[in-house]
Amino acid sequence: MEGATEKVFYSSFLRWLAKNNEGCSFNKIDNHDIGEIAFEWESGDEAVLVKFNVVGTVTQVTNSGKWFANTCSKKYKIPWRVFLCYDTDSPDKDISKFYQDDWKLLRDELKKAKAKEIVDLAACADIEDVMLIDIEGICKYLGISVPTELKGRKGKAKMKALYRSCGSTYHEGEKSADMVETLNFQKIMDDGPIDLHKLVDEIKVKSK
């Protein structure tokens, strides 16, 4: 995934999903001996190991293949499905360019490392645009009424303007966690620009 805010969003989404599905849990696992942080999704007798890799910049995309090979497939001899979470930087949903150049190299590396499946979670918007699908919830968190218009071209600028309107500052990454935890993820699933049902289907729960 592209950045730390995406990691906060997806981990919060999985916690929400577990909370709203009986018999499911999503918990952080700390392995202090090797400095590894992972997560585990449990549903009945089934457990799924979840690991996040934050790329940071597009130029680091190809390094994700080596990360997957070394920290996932070689270390844990289990079937792995890889979800590529990214912004298309385009108003349409054409993802053909994400099968070319560095992205093709990444996909080849993942296949070489025996990824069972590669799933695209592509959004024609940045992560703040996705979160702003629940603008009512964000405004409630900020203690303000919903504005008639949001200033800014992209989601990040809009989010910053929304926070400034009440004298607050929007911070990305872990500092956004308190706000993200309050989001209406059902609304985002239903109306958002990312097909989160792909993730739900993979961990074998029925979205409500």
Stretch-by-stretch model annotation:
Residues 7-208:
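C-terminal accessory helical subdomains adjacent to catalytic cores in phosphodiester-
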Residues 1-2:
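Short hydrophobic beta-strand that contains or immediately precedes a catalytic carboxylate
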